[in-house]
């Protein structure tokens, strides 16, 4: 079993093209089902999830292929998961 802290320590990598998205900064949880729906990773150019562009990667849980000791492997198209931050 993993905790949020554990996920934040893992780098997210796309198996399609080897892109390194960064580290998990947040989760979207479906409260009705009690399941994680989406992993959120700060977009390109962001430092510590704070400074930089106002974009983020929103990776649906269904796109996660493997959670390893140090990394999270995902299989998705970058242009479909890189979105404007709505905060």
Regions found by a protein language model. Name each.
Residues 1-87:
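Peripheral interaction segments used for macromolecular assembly
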């Amino acid at each position: 079993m993993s905790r949020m802290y554990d996920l934040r320590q893992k780098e997210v990598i796309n198996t399609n093209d080897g892109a390194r998205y960064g580290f998990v900064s947040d989760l979207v949880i479906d409260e009705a089902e009690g399941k994680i729906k989406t992993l959120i990773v700060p977009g390109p150019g962001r430092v510590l999830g704070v400074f930089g562009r106002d974009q983020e990667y929103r990776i649906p849980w269904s796109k996660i292929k493997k959670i390893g000791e140090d990394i999270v492997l995902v299989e998705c198209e970058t242009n479909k998961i890189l979105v404007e931050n709505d905060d």
